[in-house]
Each structure stands twice: as structure tokens, then as C-alpha cells.
Curated annotation (Swiss-Prot):
Disulfide bonds join C61-C75, C68-C79, C74-C84. This is Uncharacterized protein SJCHGC06711. It is found in: Secreted. The keyword Transferase does not apply.
Amino acid sequence: MMSTQHFILSLTILIIISNLHDEVNACRELGEECVTRGPKSCCEPLICGLKSHGTGVCVKCIPGGSECKKSEDCCSKRCKSGYCKFK
């Protein structure tokens, strides 16, 4: 039979593991730091507006003059030569 101390220790470990799992798999919200892919990517429909190589901040759209991959990610809806065009 499990003692009370063992039960509490087991429950504590389970809670810690559960919280770590949620943190690792949680998408990032508006204004939070992000990476372009993986567990720290932005929640849809937000996108990661890059600040440096592969990292940035979650935004609704990428402003003119910033790096882009697709026109739909730009506020102007125009991505040309890897940069969002100004409106």
C-alpha cells in the first residue's frame, strides 16, 4: 500500500511533468517571443515577425521593410524579393 508521503510525491511529480508538457507544446500569443517553427511558434492566425535569425515576436502581420516568405504574411499583402512592401 502506498504511504501518504509517496502519494503526495507522486502527485507533485505528475503535476510538474504536466506543466512542463503544456509549456513546451503551447503556442505563443501576440507580442510574445517566438521562433518560426516548432513548439515556440505563434498561435494561428499570428505569425512570427523576425527580429533576428529565426527568432522574433508574434504579430498579426509583418510591416513593410521586414523579411517575409509569403505575401499573405505582410500587412501590405505584398512580399517581393524576401521583404514586405510598404502600403
